[in-house]
């Protein structure tokens, strides 16, 4: 009898562990948030999500897909959550729920052009063609600037066209623009658009309120931790001092 009980407890324990798997969608083309390095997904979002999952007792199963396919995949229950440097905009909140923001510093969006161009500010790009990634908030910024957005599956594709002068500019989050400016020739930054949109958060299905709260509580606990500070310093060194100063004020 004791052996039977022990076996049942082992089975229940195994099932419980399996139930703690969390399928998380991302788009590994958005350095330094998430990107591929030696065929392995790395980045701030990847490490931070693993940190949250460990704290809450989940095993993350990563699913890499196109940015515009993330929320549909979440709604169709192909994944349980999305972390991809995604802003919790009012439009997106109509379809899904979000955690509290997990990025706690101010950012913006850089306007990048070909180095040979004579454009000086974002205003010079009114009526011009601006490359943005499909499904991102940069499309709205381009429209608000009076530019014509051209949609790409990735920002890398947009920058390749910019290098070849097939488009007039690219609008991208400043934190990611830094990486492209370091590694790609023939492009330059001319302006920055102040970001008034909500900061990056983790997306969940509307029905998963308990899961969203669980992660929100963990985010708020971790934001003052040494682990979080180390991740900021590693992936966003230009924001580290401002981040530390903001924490000390609280």
Question: For the regions a protein language model found, what residue spans apply to each?
Answer:
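A ligand-binding cleft/hinge motif common to bilobed small-molecule-binding domains
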Residues: 72, 85-95, 141, 168-196
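Extracytoplasmic small-molecule ligand-binding "clamshell" domains
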Residues: 19-86
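A conserved helix-loop-strand patch within extracytoplasmic ligand-binding domains
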Residues: 58, 87-88, 100-145
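Short helix-initiation/N-cap motifs at beta->coil->alpha
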Residues: 61-74, 134-135, 150-164, 196
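Alpha-to-beta junction loops
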Residues: 58-59, 76-84, 128, 163-176, ...
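Extended ligand-binding regions for polar small-molecule ligands
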Residues: 46-55, 116-119, 123-124, 129, ...
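Ligand-binding clefts/hinges and TM-proximal coupling segments of bilobed small-molecule sensing domains
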Residues: 137-150, 189-191, 219-250
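Periplasmic-binding protein-like
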Residues: 28, 105-113, 178-220, 238-250
